[in-house]
């Protein structure tokens, strides 16, 4: 076992399901700490999710604006959604969310990595993707999903992130990663020219 993990790992002594909801499941666990003491950990289990940053050939991000009840405000976000099943293919889920929320399909889908939204209390993992070569059709949001689709230049989105106007974490991470990918592509293209 990794020595660092051995020094820092907390081991579960007991686990109790407190709330078993449709989307989340709340647990209270008693854990053994690395120094031998015990403590309580409250956490939420979540099936996982995907998020997609769709970029047009003109450099615009297709994003959605929707009311988030838990925060009681409107947020600008990239298309995203929870997995329908724990064994659902994440690429298929990303393509589904892209189509449902924006009406788009893509020629290229690049995995940007894994994002853990709130690791102290939530085990949700969000796989982030970058969609290019977009073709547009009709949106098909879920019955309880009300959102507006917007096109915002990537450079503007970067500035919105830096000014604190975009507060959704997955969107911040995806915007900054895609911006860096495009910067490196441009640099590689310049270097190839000589």
What positions do the PLM features span?
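Conserved Nudix-box catalytic region and its N-terminal flanking loop in Nudix hydrolases
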Residues: 2, 6-7, 41, 51-96
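Nudix hydrolase/Nudix homology domain
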Residues: 2-13, 37, 126, 144-194
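Hydrophobic residues on conserved beta-strands that form the core of alpha/beta folds
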Residues: 12, 26-28, 40, 64, ...
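Acidic, metal-coordinating catalytic segment for phosphate/diphosphate chemistry
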Residues: 14-51, 57
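Residue-level detector of high-confidence beta-strand sites
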Residues: 15, 64-66, 114
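Short beta-strand micro-motifs in enzyme catalytic cores
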Residues: 25-29, 74, 125-127, 148
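Unchanged
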Residues: 39, 48-51, 56, 82-169
